[in-house]
Amino acid sequence: MSPMNRQRKNKSNVLNEKDERPGCIIKEKSSVRSMAKTQPTSGRTISLSEINKPIALSKKNTEIKAAVEIQNRLTKKMAKNSERRKKMAHGPEMTAQNRTQERIDFVEFLDRHYQVMQAGVSTVKVHKMHYTKEEFENVIYEAQTIFSSEKALVDIDPPCVVVGNLHGQFNDLINMFILLGRPPETVYVFTECVTSIPKCGEEIWALFQRCFNNLPISALIATKILCMHGGLSPALTCLDELRNHPKPIRNPFRGIVNDMLWADPDPSVFEWKTSSRGSGFTFGTNVIDDVCKRLGVELIIRAHQMCFDGYWVLSGRKLITIFSAPMYCNFYKNTGCVLKVDETLGIQTVAFVPESENIEKIIEEMNRVWDISIDCIE
């Protein structure tokens, strides 16, 4: 049984459990209706690392042979382009010396995004944003400068808002800022696994890749709430291993970073099990309890899996999975969810309900999504 199916079956029982453990307080969910219909983000991406080897066929069929020769040439060209992109992504970091343009006004830059949105009105036309190459380079440079100066484990002071997977639904991100508070006045912790697809020019794509190499692995809120994208690692023994992990981090394929990007909780697993994703592990509820005790944290917040309700609670409320993209890809009738953490580490779930006919009835039939009768942990 998949985690999502187990969620539908067991969630009502999990949410009504009482936990005498002091500290983090999970409050009832408040719902926020989505302001604009999400633009589809679906698409097909071909992995250049999985290119087939050249095919050898008989010389009898000249047409097939000609087709195979064309395929082999394209395969070699794609492989060559892939190697060039790898070299570009691992090239020198952008610095003030190799950056020629003047700095942009980031206040004005952000205001452009807010001006094309209007909270609470679904009929507003959402215009696409257009950027110059100089704007791309400025934003990437400033972000890379900040990321490079931070540890791999970032310490966050509450209050803040924790966001899960958005999957490129940019309109929902801007709507979130409008409703819950605009940065930098409101602090946001993103557990999204950021990727960059080379469709905006190889040079800009490479700049994004080098910037992303400096992103932190996880965040620690008030020393008690640990946030990451995927999950836990059997190699993780203390928080200093995360805090002191060297950066930049380039394409980890094993170890703590890889596990924390790919791992998933699974109540049917006793301890650890190799993940069916092909990378990382699945881990059971006893692992969650042990890790919280060993690291001295009271709650783990992660993303990485879609939840129709927007969130999924495990292990006596010691682990929460959140999914923040409502109406995912304009296909799933799901709710998005974020977590608001206040100064006392009280946690409130905020639901972003997509505008659709009978959406409340649809989701209620799935799992009674935003039930305000959920008990608080006192």
Curated annotation (Swiss-Prot):
One cellular-component annotation, GO: nucleus
Source taxon at top rank: Eukaryota
Coiled-coil region: none
Biased composition (Basic residues): 1-11
Disordered, as annotated region: 1-23
Molecular function in Gene Ontology: protein serine/threonine phosphatase activity
Pfam family, one: Metallophos
Secretion signal, residue range per the UniProt entry: none
Disulphides: none
Protein's UniProt name: Uncharacterized protein C30A5.4
Organism field: Caenorhabditis elegans
